[in-house]
């Protein structure tokens, strides 16, 4: 049995407004990752401040909070082997100009402040961020029909 890890992913307002949600979900699913939780929401100021708490003292914090609240977002819990590192590699670098073609940011993002997507940077961050956005009852447990072909 393969040990599966969960990570938190959010399509930011720019990704939602540009109609990229379906393409992004498809990339994760085609890679063999499983979406076990998903919701569209408008992030409250309180939730935005909790989510980005580690940046509270930084000069860009107010803009970060303002942007994440500027429109609807799509929050997801994604599960799979090494999900945190797998998803991070699929996203590309935070600065889109440094992101390789074929990554989500390399293909769709132009500006660091509007970089389409957020994902947890560690298993600890994933647990914290998942708990901010999802109740345990909102996360599904199921097996993909192709799991026997994905993992040894």
From Swiss-Prot:
The active site is at 118 (pros-phosphohistidine intermediate). Transmembrane segments: none annotated. Its EC number is 2.7.4.6. One of its GO terms (biological process) is CTP biosynthetic process. It catalyses: a 2'-deoxyribonucleoside 5'-diphosphate + ATP = a 2'-deoxyribonucleoside 5'-triphosphate + ADP; a ribonucleoside 5'-diphosphate + ATP = a ribonucleoside 5'-triphosphate + ADP. Its cofactor is Mg(2+). GO terms for molecular function: ATP binding; metal ion binding; nucleoside diphosphate kinase activity. Pfam families: NDK. ATP binds at residues 12, 60, 88, 94, 105, 115. SUPFAM superfamilies: Nucleoside diphosphate kinase, NDK (SSF54919). One of its GO terms (cellular component) is cytoplasm. The keyword DNA damage does not apply. Coiled coil: none annotated. It is found in: Cytoplasm. Keywords: ATP-binding, Cytoplasm, Kinase, Magnesium, Metal-binding, Nucleotide metabolism, Nucleotide-binding, Phosphoprotein, Transferase. It is an enzyme of class 2 (transferase). Major role in the synthesis of nucleoside triphosphates other than ATP. The ATP gamma phosphate is transferred to the NDP beta phosphate via a ping-pong mechanism, using a phosphorylated active-site intermediate. Belongs to the NDK family. This is Nucleoside diphosphate kinase. It comes from Methanocella arvoryzae (strain DSM 22066 / NBRC 105507 / MRE50).
